[in-house]
Amino acid sequence: MDKRSLYDGLNSLETDLDSSVTQLREIKAALHELVEKNTTLEIENQRLREHLQELNKLAGNTTETEKQELSKSRMNLEKLYEEGFHVCNILYGSRRENDEECAFCLDVIYGERTR
């Protein structure tokens, strides 16, 4: 390989890398915007839930769903489950394949406990 073709190949590689870095920066910026928006929406959603609960309490409506509200620990388990992880004692912490439902996990989160 002569010096000229080596130099041209190196310039081509540099151009490709610059292009890749530019694309990576654009993707990173888009991801940052999405994470920011997601966080904002989660906070707004939580505030709206709390406001709705306050309105229901003020109205004196004690519905069946309010009586069966999940505890904070079960809500944490539910969040982990929704993120794609097992929360059952059999496969705890491992990823759910293709986000398939797990009867054991659902029982841990929503099942009746009499202890």
Swiss-Prot record:
Annotated positions binding Zn(2+): 86, 88, 102, 105
Main location: cytoplasm
SS bond list: none
Cofactor info, note text: Binds 1 zinc ion per subunit.
Gene Ontology CC terms, in alphabetical order: nucleoid
Cofactor(s) recorded in Swiss-Prot or TrEMBL: Zn(2+)
Compartment list: Cytoplasm, Nucleoid
InterPro entries the record matches: YabA
Keyword set, alphabetical order: Cytoplasm, DNA replication, DNA replication inhibitor, Metal-binding, Zinc
GO BP: DNA replication
Record note on quaternary structure: Homotetramer. Interacts with both DnaA and DnaN, acting as a bridge between these two proteins.
Function: Involved in control of chromosome replication initiation. Inhibits the cooperative binding of DnaA to the oriC region, thus negatively regulating initiation of chromosome replication. Inhibits the ability of DnaA-ATP to form a helix on DNA; does not disassemble preformed DnaA-DNA helices. Decreases the residence time of DnaA on the chromosome at its binding sites (oriC, replication forks and promoter-binding sites). Tethers DnaA to the replication machinery via the DNA polymerase beta sliding clamp subunit (dnaN).
Protein name: Replication initiation control protein YabA
